[in-house]
Swiss-Prot record:
Pfam family, one: DUF520
Record-linked InterPro entries: DUF520, UPF0234-like_C, UPF0234_N, YajQ-like_sf
Keyword Nucleotide-binding recorded: yes
Provenance organism: Cytophaga hutchinsonii (strain ATCC 33406 / DSM 1761 / CIP 103989 / NBRC 15051 / NCIMB 9469 / D465)
UniProt name for this protein: Nucleotide-binding protein CHU_2278
């Protein structure tokens, strides 16, 4: 019986590469000349920490990071943009947590979308992934296309197509 898994994971090395390219771009840009800007990645907690001098530069840096992540194949939905920036003296700091895994609410939403589609497939939640099984590979490919067209709120990857 053919099946595939739906996961939401970010490769830490790819994320690190994207941040290195973003750091390099920031050091060469004219509008960031002589600015005290830092981008750090806490690999254990999966948090990107951005520090700079004002909120205008902060927005520009976040845009650069998102652009570089997209060029590396990482979806912008993998970042939790809900945490606001905070100031400490003349510097502005912001933490961007990286989401790994599919939360319960998103799992329910994905399973509901799959069941409402009317395809002859069965989704099953397994910890932080969803396994979808069906009789035909064509049905599974239709489900993948359906989920790519819908906005679920998390970055989805489809792995282990058997």
């Amino acid at each position: 019986m053919p099946s595939f898994d739906i996961v939401s994971k970010v490769d830490p090395q790819t994320l690190d590469n994207a941040l290195n390219v973003a750091r390099k771009e920031i050091t060469t840009r004219y509008d960031f000349r002589d600015s005290k800007t830092e981008i750090d990645l806490d690999k254990k907690a999966s948090i990107i920490k951005v520090t700079t001098e004002n909120s205008m530069r902060m927005n520009a840096i976040v845009d650069i990071v998102i652009t570089r992540m997209a060029k590396q194949g990482i979806d912008a939905k993998a970042l939790d943009m809900s945490k606001e920036e905070y100031a400490s003296g003349p510097m502005v700091k912001r933490e961007l947590p990286v989401k790994n895994g599919i939360d319960k609410e998103s799992c329910k939403k994905i399973i509901k979308i799959i069941k409402d589609s009317g395809s002859k497939v069965t989704p099953a939640q397994m910890d932080d992934l969803i396994r979808v099984t069906g009789k035909k590979i064509d049905d599974l490919q239709e489900i993948i296309a359906l989920l790519r067209s819908k906005d679920v709120g998390v970055a989805l990857q489809f792995i282990n197509m058997k």
